């Protein structure tokens, strides 16, 4: 009996030993190339998520820079794209989730949170227009004796805009005060020929270089007109006072220096010069025109201070 068990055990060992080479050959198969592709794609998505998240965060950081640093080369241009960095952050967050990049996701969330906080007031107003104002501007014809008015501003880009189209907009939108920037003598002449004086007969136009200027047109008289209300280094910014329901409102046609290479510092200076108008506390101002800046630019927010408000943000 013991011998039989011993023989059986030896046969079993030999059988297992003989099976080993077959098992080794089975594990030597080459890895399929298709199995590598998802891993490479995963790494690419992770790289893009990280890059987009860093760019979105850099955009948010640029928006938070103090005024003196926002005059650095190209900083104003980057800041002007602030709302778009929100979209870039959302794309980065989606890619980070797909590729499981936690750090990239956290950076993207931080950028989205900052930009969302800054842009939210532009989409939700806590102080809507009074019903009386809505009724006034919705009337078939403007009432120049009340305290409400529709105003409009255009940069006509070196006098290349269509004067007839502007006059038609003034008529159709019942505009009572119009501000134009980069006008020329020829453009103003064509504007008069198109009939602007029929709707806005009072005007004040001025030019600092004799070529391009800024102007104001009004349905009611412009009291105390000036060629340059701001004493700006950028351009003459004409002003005039309009009686609106017994309230004297000072309108100014604004055109600051553009933030382009070689003029970064001049751009900030022209906004700082506007900021000096906060000291005129006895005058109620409406500044209309081409500020070459948005609310995201620190120098623009400094100009507003606690005295002025941005109409786009308030509306």
Predicted regions and their residues:
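N-terminal Lys/Arg-rich, disordered targeting/topogenic segments
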Residues: 1-43
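N-terminal export and membrane-targeting signals
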Residues: 32-51, 97-105
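Membrane-proximal helical "anchor" segments flanking the first transmembrane region
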Residues: 38-39, 43, 56, 76-78, ...
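Membrane-embedded alpha-helical segments of integral membrane proteins
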Residues: 47-96
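Glycine/proline-rich, flexible active-site/cofactor-binding loop segments
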Residues: 89, 95-121, 231-250, 254-255
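N-terminal signal-anchor transmembrane helix
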Residues: 98, 106-172
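Soluble catalytic domains of enzymes that build or remodel membrane lipids, polysaccharides, and related
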Residues: 151, 157-171, 180-315
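Internal catalytic or translocation cores that form aromatic/hydrophobic pockets or channels
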Residues: 175
